[in-house]
Amino acid sequence: MGQFIFVSFGFLVVATSLSGTEAGFCCPLGWSSYDEHCYQVFQQKMNWEDAEKFCTQQHKGSHLVSFHSSEEVDFVTSKTFPILKYDFVWIGLSNVWNECTKEWSDGTKLDYKAWSGGSDCIVSKTTDNQWLSMDCSSKRYVVCKFQA
């Protein structure tokens, strides 16, 4: 009986120490975790529409990356720059449905933005928190994201 209590107490200590960390979820092999989401950088270049479709085929609930804080952008930049160096990646922000406002392809609220201007689709630089408008038919690298 004493051994059972000791082992049970050990599990309680471990569970308590892990609560509040990202230990409660796990991303698939090859994906990186941040704030209860999983991210993967792909080295294929494609247009925005093909990139979004590609992401939806990678994992259930996956879309082109959406950003909701500068910290999240910094995390993605830390993943893209070592692989892609100085380049651009598609992000899920666009106006490809020709509505009045841009929106994230994953349906989340547009609560953070770092771009100005023009075209229907947005890219993010792999080096910093800078977004640019770009023609949707341009071929760019892809970062996919889903909620874990």
From Swiss-Prot:
GO terms for cellular component: extracellular region. GO terms for molecular function: toxin activity. Residues 1-23 form the signal peptide. Expressed by the venom gland. It holds the Pfam family Lectin_C. It is found in: Secreted. Residues 34-145 form the C-type lectin domain. Keywords: Disulfide bond, Hemostasis impairing toxin, Platelet aggregation inhibiting toxin, Secreted, Signal, Toxin. Gene3D superfamilies: Mannose-Binding Protein A, subunit A. InterPro entries: C-type_lectin-like (IPR001304), C-type_lectin-like/link_sf (IPR016186), C-type_lectin/snaclec_domain (IPR050111), C-type_lectin_CS (IPR018378), CTDL_fold (IPR016187). The keyword Secreted applies. The keyword Transmembrane does not apply. Disulfide bonds join C27-C38, C55-C144, C121-C136. Tetramer of heterodimers of alpha and beta subunits (alphabeta)(4); disulfide-linked. Strong platelet aggregation inhibitor. Binds specifically to platelet glycoprotein Ibalpha (GP1BA) with high affinity and inhibits vWF-dependent platelet aggregation. Has also been observed to induce small agglutinates in washed platelets by binding to GPIb. Belongs to the snaclec family. Negative results: has no effect on ADP- and collagen-induced platelet aggregation in platelet rich plasma. This is Snaclec flavocetin-A subunit beta. It comes from Protobothrops flavoviridis. The lineage of its organism: Eukaryota, Metazoa, Chordata, Craniata, Vertebrata.
